[in-house]
Amino acid sequence: MVKCMKPGKAVILLQGRYTGKKAVIVKSFDDGTVEKKYGHCLVAGLKKYPSKVIRKDSAKKTAKKSRVKCFFKVINYQHVMPTRYTLDLDLKNVVSADAISSKDKKVTALKEAKAKFEERFKTGKNRWFFTKLRF
């Protein structure tokens, strides 16, 4: 069987608090682990998407509208839908299973991930990932 849940693949979450949000797979566990015996993956996604910027907005307002909020989550393969898109964003050294467990590591990891997502948004790459899913 071909493994389609590879790191860098953009997915849409189907269950939980972040239902309908877009995320990118950071690390996949196809055979499971000791704690979770099913296939799952560590994802980093967008909790809050950037707003639409118009020409007459000031620089301050444009900066505010370009902000994103992100999240990390370990999620079952059954609860994600893979897309055809990939994000070549290197979050492997930022996000780890150990960063999720402790509060202070998670806060620093979230800040680093937020900076990477915002930088990617400002360069204009992967436009689809930064638009809200309409349904």
From Swiss-Prot:
Task: List the Gene Ontology MF annotations in alphabetical order.
Answer: structural constituent of ribosome
The UniProt entry's coiled-coil ranges are: none
**Cellular component terms (Gene Ontology):** cytosolic large ribosomal subunit; endoplasmic reticulum
Q: Which PROSITE patterns match?
A: RIBOSOMAL_L27E
One Pfam family named in its UniProt record: Ribosomal_L27e
State the PANTHER family in the record: 60S RIBOSOMAL PROTEIN L27
Hey, which family's this protein in?
A: Belongs to the eukaryotic ribosomal protein eL27 family.
Q: What is this protein called?
A: Large ribosomal subunit protein eL27z
Which species is listed as the source? Arabidopsis thaliana
Its gene name is RPL27A
